[in-house]
């Protein structure tokens, strides 16, 4: 999971802190005018709107304009990296995160986002190193724990992953994806009862959460509760039909192997 800096106030404050110091003190980087700042504000609004609408290619174009106008702004670089991750432009995204980290080595978000890109490349050790750095900077970063759990899952370190997911849920009790990930791992390590209990709790609290509906379908089908499994499936695919695609579930959503196998049995009516 990546983290966007979508608060216009935060972006503008970052610009102010940069333009009021380093940029203002060199001939190569003259002070920005009020007109430039207003134009930047307008572009940032467009970038945020495009991001919220899922138009990541357009968002990338806007963030590029901001990077060119405000090259010392780490938030602009990090957000363009996120737009590129969302389009699977992973190497270009990592280059952007590297630049953001160079500009702001004590900022947590670029490390978190670079970790996500590295994880998508299967570079789990490097991703974990970035998540560890986030936790050095902010020991209570729930998303860093969740993401590190994802990377640990990628390495097959299920107990370590479960510890991270639990920690993320402890820090942020409403972090539904961390709880869902923990439930998936419960099933992976043979704790089916705990998996079902957590999935049912999540469905009650978040009835529009397709990942948990699909997971509960797979688990219930495999323990002989076909009727309830079917009802959850109708709800799940009604919200997100990608769960019908085993390859997507395995390689993009990255469910644990036992969960993928359970879903496969359901899809093939075994």
Regions found by a protein language model. Give the residues of each.
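TPR/TPR-like (Sel1-like) alpha-helical repeat modules
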Residues: 204, 210, 214-244
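Conserved alpha-helical positions within TPR/SEL1-like repeat arrays
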Residues: 41-52, 64, 75-86, 95-98, ...
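Terminal, low-structured helical/coil segments at or just beyond the last alpha-helical repeat
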Residues: 25-36, 228-270
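Conserved structural position within tetratricopeptide repeats
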Residues: 61, 65-68, 99-102, 133-136, ...
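N-terminal leader/linker segments that initiate helical-solenoid repeat arrays
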Residues: 2-6, 13-70, 270
């Amino acid at each position: 999971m990546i983290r966007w800096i979508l608060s216009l106030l935060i972006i503008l404050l970052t610009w102010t802190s940069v333009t009021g110091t380093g940029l203002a003190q060199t001939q190569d980087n003259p002070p920005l005018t009020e007109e430039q700042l207003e134009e930047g504000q307008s572009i940032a609004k467009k970038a945020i709107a495009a991001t919220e609408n899922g138009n990541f290619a357009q968002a990338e174009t806007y963030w590029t304009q901001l990077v060119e106008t405000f090259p010392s702004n780490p938030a602009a670089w990090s957000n363009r990296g996120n737009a590129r991750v969302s389009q699977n432009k992973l190497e270009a995204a990592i280059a952007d995160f590297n630049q953001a980290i160079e500009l702001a080595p004590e900022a947590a978000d670029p490390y978190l986002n670079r970790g996500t890109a590295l994880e998508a490349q299967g570079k789990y050790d490097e991703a974990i190193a970035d998540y560890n750095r986030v936790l050095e900077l902010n020991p209570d970063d729930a998303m860093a724990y969740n993401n590190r759990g994802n990377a640990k899952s990628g390495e097959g370190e299920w107990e370590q992953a479960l510890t991270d997911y639990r920690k993320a849920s402890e820090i942020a009790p409403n972090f539904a994806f961390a709880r869902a990930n923990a439930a998936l791992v419960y099933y992976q390590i043979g704790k089916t009862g705990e998996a079902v209990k957590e999935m049912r709790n999540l469905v009650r609290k978040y009835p529009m959460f397709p990942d948990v509906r699909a997971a509960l379908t797979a688990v219930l089908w495999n323990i002989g509760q076909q009727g309830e499994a079917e009802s959850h499936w109708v709800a799940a695919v009604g919200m997100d039909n990608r769960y019908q695609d085993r390859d997507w579930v395995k390689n993009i959503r990255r469910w644990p192997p036992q969960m993928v196998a359970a879903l496969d049995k359901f899809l093939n009516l075994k």
